[in-house]
Amino acid sequence: MLSKQIPLGIYEKALPAGECWLERLRLAKTLGFDFVEMSVDETDARLARLDWSREQRLALVSAVAETGVRVPSMCLSAHRRFPLGSEDDAVRAQGLEIMRKAIQFAQDVGIRVIQLAGYDVYYQQANDETRCRFRDGLKESVDMASRAQVTLAMEIMDYPLMNSISKALGYAHYLNNPWFQLYPDIGNLSAWDNDVQMELQAGIGHIVAVHVKDTKPGVFKNVPFGEGVVDFESCFATLKQSGYCGPYLIEMWSETAENPAAEVAKARDWVKARMASAGLVEAA
């Protein structure tokens, strides 16, 4: 029987850098996490994962089986560099090829959810054409994901195009496909002028996972928990009352810290205390 416990995961970039997934998953287990979210960002090193050999993919599957710590999701931020809305046909084609490879990779190793970055373009100026190309690129991507039975889930971003659940729902309704859902980040959601609880309630039925981090207006990364504007207890309580039973992922970038494990343990305890106050988990 599956546990009724709320699944709590940690972002890969919170843990020490490196390519040994067995070591990473063992550490995550020691720290009390149920799963790790993989990052495929715009760096050549992490993009290279999409070209892993059969043996490398099997090694990841084996590490999951040995440790019992899952890798159910991928944060695919590589589209900052190769955006689906690019007006350069070659760049856009590369973005679609990255999507194809990511979906194939997910299918091979058991990743169920690919979190998408909601940028039509990132390093260029957005306009009506980039938004149109982005929509068309999403449609093509969701068609690929449907055939592979892999869910694409849109993150709520640090970018105006996708800075609320309401805006992301517009894309969900446009695509009208069960393999396209939402993956809100309560930090990003709170950093904008959103009615956060109303937004979370609006997304119920489409939310497949939740990123947990703190933010300040205009500051979307590396804000220590408790020093930002996020009302964690209210967010957790709203999600619980709305019937959300899915995973929560602590998002941090402590892989280059002097002691990443200690940083993660501190954040884990802080977040779990707020979860307990909201009735999501039992108090320690």
Curated annotation (Swiss-Prot):
GO terms for biological process: L-ascorbic acid catabolic process. The gene is ulaE. It is an enzyme of class 5 (isomerase). SUPFAM superfamilies: Xylose isomerase-like. One of its GO terms (molecular function) is intramolecular oxidoreductase activity, interconverting aldoses and ketoses. The keyword Repressor does not apply. This is L-ribulose-5-phosphate 3-epimerase UlaE. Pathway: Cofactor degradation; L-ascorbate degradation; D-xylulose 5-phosphate from L-ascorbate: step 3/4. Belongs to the L-ribulose-5-phosphate 3-epimerase family. Induction: Induced by L-ascorbate. Repressed by UlaR. Transmembrane segments: none annotated. Keywords: Isomerase. It catalyses: L-ribulose 5-phosphate = L-xylulose 5-phosphate. PANTHER family: ISOMERASE, L-RIBULOSE-5-PHOSPHATE 3-EPIMERASE ULAE. Pfam families: AP_endonuc_2. It comes from the Bacteria. The keyword Glycoprotein does not apply.
